């Protein structure tokens, strides 16, 4: 399979020079389901914003679906190739009705009304929202329903890749189960950033672990998430369903002294803590 996402030696810093990403390199192939994990401040959201063309890399190379995101033209073009679901759905559900929200993206692509209508109908069906929802006011929907509308809006673009930032953050257990079922029914490539490691294990086959802007592990989800020593070193915990499935945690080791971790990929360094 060819690579849909190519990230090479990516770096980014927020003013006045605080590094958010440091020498990050990875590739995603068509159809992969990948989880992005790490403690708060690891750089996960920054990485998603760069992949979405909303931030410009400070150094390195980034290409998504053939679009060179190191150029202004590439960052404009990539919006036709991907769908993004933000952590706070109120940041992207802004129209008067559910139908208007889901139709917003396809209309901006310049599609004829008939094609937009077909995409809206298909996207709502894929997230389990019937015709009765089309005229609903998004402000009055539950958190789970808003999440579905946001995903439908992304799917209406018919993206090659779907980026989701903390998709379970405001969902109850039932909402998380329903979201998992929706994602299981999608064939689109997806990158999911989440602190809910159980959800990542349930929905992803591969995991990238970021800490202090560095890629510290990249490998099969069950291997990365079940490694108690790795999780402990980066301030994370093994998901309950995997407890005891991997190596037990040793006594806590200072992160600055931790060796590079490998799950099929070589890493030059682990984060150094201030």
Task: Please name every model-derived segment.
Residues 114-132:
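Conserved ABC ATPase "signature" region
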Residues 61-77:
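ABC ATPase NBD Q-loop/coupling interface
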Residues 200-202:
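A short, surface-exposed alpha-helical micro-motif characterized by mixed small hydrophobic
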Residues 52:
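Helix-to-loop junction immediately C-terminal to a conserved catalytic motif
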Residues 194-195:
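H-loop/switch region of ABC-family ATPase nucleotide-binding domains
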Residues 137-141, 145:
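Conserved ABC ATPase signature
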